[in-house]
Amino acid sequence: MKILDWSQLDGAAQTDALTRPVQTVAARTRDAVAALIADVRTRGDAALREITAHFDGVSLDSFAVSEAEFAAAEAAVPPELRQAMQDAVARIDTFHRAGMSGGYAVETAPGVVCEKIVRPIGRVGLYVPAGSAPLPSTALMLGVPARLAGCREVVLCTPPRKDGSVDPAVLVAARLTGVRRVFKLGGAQAIAAMAYGTESLPSCDKLFGPGNSYVTEAKQQVAQSGAAAIDMPAGPSEVLVIADAGAQPAFVAADLLSQAEHGPDSQVLLLSDSDALIGAVRAQLEVQLAQLSRADIARQALAQSRLIKVQTLDEAFAISNRYAPEHLILALREPRGWLAQVEAAGSVFLGDYTPEALGDYCSGTNHVLPTSGAARAYSGVSVASFQNMVSVQAASKAGIDGIGACALVLARAEGLDAHANAVALRMGVAA
């Protein structure tokens, strides 16, 4: 990893230091995804079979996972893994249940009541990537809030393996959260199928889940077309660590590597006011890399990442807020005291004993988070992500008589005569 001194960089160099590996979508990626989506919309399952054979190397007669396959998955998953997933589900449920809203009602004027009522989204589609490794934890993170929200139907897509099966742990994770319909589909084609529907898959109202640049681009394209809403831009993973001189170099290095091993397009950043800490972390990276099975992938990610020396921790937080990381680790002596300075981050991890990996798996928070700077305006997945808040209002005759004059003045100011007339008729006055 490159070591940079922030104070020695001009504006352009600072911008370059914070640029993600996948900051923009290449035109060819955009065009390829658009063509794939159009093919799925036109030819349905036939297109899915051809695309799956080409990209996943397997020919499928049926995309739906059968009951026999679910049973085989249950038998294949080791008891300790199943128990770990059950424990994670319990904590994810506890955290997400605590944040649920039941709506509210308020009388805004005598005889005028305004409400918010909560309704589940009817049918949702969950995407669980497999890429270089299956991610059953993502099935847990999406399935639990979908269940709590009360969605009528939940569909899950995950890429098939070369033998036409799906990773058993993903199937068990799906069942643990109540998901019954799982399809062997990956990539942009899965997004297209869930958005528009095919002979095998129903069209969904909203799509959830992370993925590579093709999946992220597909989600954005189907959302722009109005076919399905999406949770957020959720692309390659990233972490930013702010560490002081008292941080443990081995811990910091381990946190950086835990994100770097996700893929070559991941990005990890360290900001510290301590030259000694930066040097020690750099040395620890080499020590720990030698022990990793995915060292080659991690090295590719580290080649595009930075160790940045700052003058003060205040400067570090200013940089972090500008970057708006998916994951932000505060390896500081008084981490909670600095929390007030965090303005934009998907999820924050406080102190030396809160590795980002806990949030990935089992602390209870959700690991489906905004990336690529989207944390400035988006939040991570929650139960509310799977619900609609519907506005309701009711006015009595006394109510409209009391506030109608306000509506008349505003309607006339906007030149909307029919609006004014709809109020005036009920009030028994001239529009």
Swiss-Prot record:
Amino-acid positions noted as binding Zn(2+) in the UniProt annotation, renumbered to this chain: 259, 262, 360, 419
Binding site for substrate: 237, 259, 262, 327, 360, 414, 419
Cofactor comment: Binds 1 zinc ion per subunit.
Keyword Metal-binding: yes
Keywords noted in UniProt: Amino-acid biosynthesis, Histidine biosynthesis, Metal-binding, NAD, Oxidoreductase, Zinc
GO cellular component: cytosol
InterPro entries: Ald_DH/histidinol_DH (IPR016161), Histidinol_DH_CS (IPR001692), Histidinol_DH_monofunct (IPR022695), Hstdl_DH (IPR012131)
HAMAP family: HisD
Described function: Catalyzes the sequential NAD-dependent oxidations of L-histidinol to L-histidinaldehyde and then to L-histidine.
Annotated protein name in UniProt: Histidinol dehydrogenase
Gene source species: Xanthomonas axonopodis pv. citri (strain 306)
